[in-house]
């Protein structure tokens, strides 16, 4: 089974910790391993901070966060209404190395280091940046012996059955 949620947030700094807290709460309720939850929440914070800083658009002063948990996979997408990425500004693998004196790009660099797969693109025809990242989930152990979690496939299924 799976679950997903979508938020439309005002493009203000206070929205970043709100999105992060909602993701952490959803991950905790689903039984996702705390280290994985933290990594995803940090990546989400960086993507939201980028949307707040760069996502000013003529059509909307909001941005959208969508999170999908499906089996062992989590996909998070942050989309804004700003000008989008400059053509040619991002190579296919984003920033394999970040120069020490770089004044921007750290957010995408962090997202890439925390997630399994990252995709950045512009919305077709309307402008706006879209950052999507995926991560394989691990689960908190549920039978009380305190052992760390494996993947849902290793434990015989998804703990999201009750959540979805």
Q: Where are the predicted features?
A:
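Conserved beta-strand-loop-beta-strand hairpin that lines the nucleotide-binding pocket
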Residues: 1-6, 52-164
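HAMP-domain connector/hinge
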Residues: 6-12
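A conserved hydrophobic position in a structured secondary element of the catalytic/binding core
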Residues: 11, 32, 135
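Short, structured helix-loop boundary elements
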Residues: 13-16, 37, 41, 108
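Conserved short strand/loop->alpha-helix "switch" segment adjacent to the catalytic nucleotide/phosphoryl-transfer site
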Residues: 23-45, 100-102
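Conserved polar catalytic motif of the HATPase_c/GHKL fold
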Residues: 46, 50
């Amino acid at each position: 089974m799976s679950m997903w949620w979508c938020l439309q947030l005002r493009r203000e700094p206070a929205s970043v910790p709100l999105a992060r807290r909602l993701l952490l709460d959803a991950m905790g309720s689903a039984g996702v391993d705390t280290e994985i939850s933290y990594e995803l929440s940090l990546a989400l914070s960086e993507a939201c901070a980028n949307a707040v800083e760069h996502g000013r658009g003529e059509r909307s002063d909001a941005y959208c966060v969508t999170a999908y948990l499906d089996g062992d996979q989590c996909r998070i997408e942050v989309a804004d209404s700003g000008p989008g990425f400059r053509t040619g500004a991002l190579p296919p693998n984003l920033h394999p190395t970040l120069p020490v004196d770089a004044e921007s790009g750290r957010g995408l660099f962090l997202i890439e280091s925390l997630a399994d797969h990252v995709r950045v693109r512009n919305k077709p025809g309307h402008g706006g940046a879209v950052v999507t990242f995926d991560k394989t989930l691990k689960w908190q152990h549920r039978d009380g012996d305190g052992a760390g979690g494996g993947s849902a496939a290793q434990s015989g299924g998804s703990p999201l059955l009750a959540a979805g």
